[in-house]
């Protein structure tokens, strides 16, 4: 039974489409000899001195614990038999535009989240189809027949639940969460599977004895806000499936960044520079996925005494290149760093799109 019927617009029909291992799938489509093999999109660490991050990987590679944003070195250690392929982002962008064109056959209310995923509001759609399930199946069919790629689909009455649904059965899955099913669906879900709940937050929730959606549902809102601030308010709403943000076809992202808090204070300059390089590669990956390039690099450093400093640098030409971002970040570090102070957090952000 729903405990939050008045806090959601239950009439919306939202589809979340997420391409399955998109970059790897495009490469396998173009080279069928790769089918069935562990394929990793990213620099081969044997050729880069261990540098690089995984953009994505095939499900065969995921079986070895490889995942997006993992360092290429660790990916190789987990799966030495993998085929490493440097990303061809222009090719992926072209395929992404073909997928976007398929979406537009059904609705113009499309909110792309990256090159390989988007929300679609099909409450009112171009073909007058009443069933969101039918539309999702037609989209999956179109993508397969025209591009020989698979996509997973999630359907619900808001974006949060649609995203949770698309993640539930992959690859090539289709999951529907009806209003009367939402509470039970979220209750049984591991808290680490909640969209928008990061690793550090999961660890803190575990310390509170929260491991599932059912556990989270029992925590009072005031307790969550006291422990997590604004995030606590969001967690309280997620436990109840509340998400009122509409699908925004003109969504504009103003910045893309990555930051990491270190459990062990970083003191060695070599370690700090290594982490900055890795963060730069992750930011570059996100830029490619979001089809963005920026002209401003922002470095953030939080020291062991919790004091935080930021410094930015503008460049003449927009970039999404990992090596260029890394070079600028390292330069900013040299200008900003107080070498005798330990570092507990590093962050790199690109803006100026």
From Swiss-Prot:
One annotated GO molecular function: magnesium ion binding
Signal peptide (residue range): none
UmuC domain segment(s): 14-198
Site feature Substrate discrimination, where: 23
Reactions it catalyzes: DNA(n) + a 2'-deoxyribonucleoside 5'-triphosphate = DNA(n+1) + diphosphate
Active site (catalytic residues): 117
Biological processes per GO annotation: DNA-templated DNA replication; error-prone translesion synthesis; SOS response
Gene3D superfamilies: 3.30.70.270, 3.40.1170.60, 5' to 3' exonuclease, C-terminal subdomain, DNA polymerase, Y-family, little finger domain
Alphabetical UniProt keywords: Cytoplasm, DNA damage, DNA repair, DNA replication, DNA-binding, DNA-directed DNA polymerase, Magnesium, Metal-binding, Mutator protein, Nucleotidyltransferase, Transferase
Binding note for cofactor: Binds 2 magnesium ions per subunit.
Top-level lineage group: Bacteria
Top-rank EC class of the record's enzyme: transferase
GO cellular component: cytosol
Record's subcellular location: Cytoplasm
Family: Belongs to the DNA polymerase type-Y family.
Subunit-structure text: Monomer.
Function, in words: Poorly processive, error-prone DNA polymerase involved in untargeted mutagenesis. Copies undamaged DNA at stalled replication forks, which arise in vivo from mismatched or misaligned primer ends. These misaligned primers can be extended by PolIV. Exhibits no 3'-5' exonuclease (proofreading) activity. May be involved in translesional synthesis, in conjunction with the beta clamp from PolIII.
Name of the protein this chain belongs to: DNA polymerase IV
Organism of provenance: Streptococcus pneumoniae serotype 2 (strain D39 / NCTC 7466)
Phylogenetic classification of the source organism: Bacteria, Bacillati, Bacillota, Bacilli, Lactobacillales
